[in-house]
């Protein structure tokens, strides 16, 4: 069994359901400390975070490449539906099964073993290697990576490159990497009406009827056309509720929850202003509460993308696709302090599902790609 596969199994065996790290980071810390990493645990409200760094011969003047990821996993769902227990690593048909196998304990193990091999081969490496690991990525993500980033900002720490080990591949290792992500902004809209008897509508104001024309306009609006890297911004309703459940009462208010997934072609302020303009045009009496969970980020083609594409092509023969599709990730926080952030990891077809797994044939090539990037950028 390879070192990467063995460490992956060791991590899967820890039932680290968010935000409980279950000592996964301790396992990683022991391996990294043996290489000369300075390891720091940063705890926050039940969340465990790790910042570990090993400087090269150039000291703080050297380029720094960070590996970022999360030790927490999503809940298992019904245990009886799993073919084998989710926290007991199991091999079947060339696949390793277990919660976190794809998202993202294989990436974590590959980070560690790639670093071990790199340091052994290049003991006098010039640049620095760092690890930014959290147990709060699958949860609220309020005490994880964002807290470490804030701390590093306060210290003036500089990151030059960051690889986030998210499972970005689709069918083959390296067929897709993410060089950016859309932003996410949600709104909680309450449209006020006047409750009344449904037989006397002239004595009431139906907020559903009042909202409907504005809702149709919002749904039809083209917010932007996207750009070279991003598809057009989307606006979607996730929840709509009004009424008491009775059939003879006009509701007093209508509640609407919606979400923007937006690109670098739009801004938070611009989208908010356009929503308010549409609501105001329809004469609605309303309240609207906004929450921004992440801004869009983009890493244009450059040193990191070039090194990663070359490493993937050398290791697998695949020409990779740069993509910005999908949901948000912790990359949105890291981009605040790092100009080049790219996500790359194993195929994602089984993530968050019953019988999550990774094909064993991808495990060591994943580690090799990470090591090749280290060799290209900081040796």
UniProtKB/Swiss-Prot annotation:
Keywords: Amino-acid biosynthesis, Cobalt, Diaminopimelate biosynthesis, Hydrolase, Lysine biosynthesis, Metal-binding, Zinc. Its cofactor is Zn(2+); Co(2+). Zn(2+) 1 binds at residues 70, 103, 166. It catalyses: N-succinyl-(2S,6S)-2,6-diaminopimelate + H2O = (2S,6S)-2,6-diaminopimelate + succinate. It holds the Pfam family Peptidase_M20. It is an enzyme of class 3 (hydrolase). InterPro entries: ArgE/DapE_CS (IPR001261), Bact_exopeptidase_dim_dom (IPR036264), DapE_proteobac (IPR005941), Peptidase_M20 (IPR002933), Peptidase_M20_dimer (IPR011650), Peptidase_M20A (IPR050072). Its EC number is 3.5.1.18. Binds 2 Zn(2+) or Co(2+) ions per subunit. Pathway: Amino-acid biosynthesis; L-lysine biosynthesis via DAP pathway; LL-2,6-diaminopimelate from (S)-tetrahydrodipicolinate (succinylase route): step 3/3. The active site is at residues 72, 137. One of its GO terms (biological process) is L-arginine biosynthetic process. PANTHER family: ACETYLORNITHINE DEACETYLASE, N-ACETYL-L-CITRULLINE DEACETYLASE. Homodimer. This is Succinyl-diaminopimelate desuccinylase. It comes from Burkholderia cenocepacia (strain ATCC BAA-245 / DSM 16553 / LMG 16656 / NCTC 13227 / J2315 / CF5610) (Burkholderia cepacia (strain J2315)). The lineage of its organism: Bacteria, Pseudomonadati, Pseudomonadota, Betaproteobacteria, Burkholderiales.
């Amino acid at each position: 069994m390879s070192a990467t596969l063995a460490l992956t199994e060791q991590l899967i065996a820890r039932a680290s359901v968010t935000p409980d790290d279950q000592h996964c980071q301790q396992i990683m810390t022991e391996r990294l400390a043996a290489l000369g990493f300075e390891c720091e645990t940063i705890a926050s409200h039940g969340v465990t975070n790790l910042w570990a760094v090993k400087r090269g011969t150039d000291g703080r003047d050297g380029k720094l490449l960070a590996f970022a990821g999360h030790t927490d996993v999503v809940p298992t769902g019904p245990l009886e539906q799993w073919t084998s227990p989710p926290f007991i690593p199991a091999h079947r048909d060339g696949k390793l099964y277990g919660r976190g196998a794809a998202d993202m304990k294989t990436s974590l193990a590959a980070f560690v073993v790639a670093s071990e091999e790199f340091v052994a081969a290049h003991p006098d490496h010039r640049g620095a290697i760092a690890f930014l690991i959290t147990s709060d990525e699958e949860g609220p993500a309020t005490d994880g990576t964002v807290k470490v980033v804030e701390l590093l900002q306060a210290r003036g720490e500089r990151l030059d490159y960051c690889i986030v080990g998210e499972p970005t591949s689709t069918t083959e290792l390296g067929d897709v990497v993410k060089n950016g992500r859309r932003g996410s902004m949600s709104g909680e809209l309450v449209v006020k009406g006047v409750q009344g008897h449904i037989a006397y509508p002239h004595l009431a104001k139906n907020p559903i009827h009042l909202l409907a024309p504005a809702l149709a306009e919002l749904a039809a609006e083209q917010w932007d056309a996207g750009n070279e890297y991003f598809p057009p911004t989307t606006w979607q309703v996730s929840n709509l509720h009004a009424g008491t459940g009775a059939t003879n009462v006009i509701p007093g208010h209508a509640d609407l929850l919606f979400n923007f997934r937006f690109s670098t072609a739009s801004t938070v302020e611009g989208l908010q202003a356009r929503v308010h303009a549409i609501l105001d045009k329809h004469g609605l009496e309303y309240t609207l509460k906004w929450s921004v969970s992440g801004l869009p980020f983009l890493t244009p083609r450059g040193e990191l993308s070039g090194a990663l594409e070359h490493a993937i092509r050398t290791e697998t023969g695949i020409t990779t696709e740069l993509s910005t599709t999908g949901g948000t990730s912790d990359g949105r926080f890291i981009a605040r302090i790092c100009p080049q952030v790219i996500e790359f990891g194993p195929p994602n077809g089984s993530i968050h599902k019953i019988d999550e797994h990774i094909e064993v044939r991808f495990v060591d090539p994943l580690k090799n790609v990470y090591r090749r990037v280290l060799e290209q950028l900081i040796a």
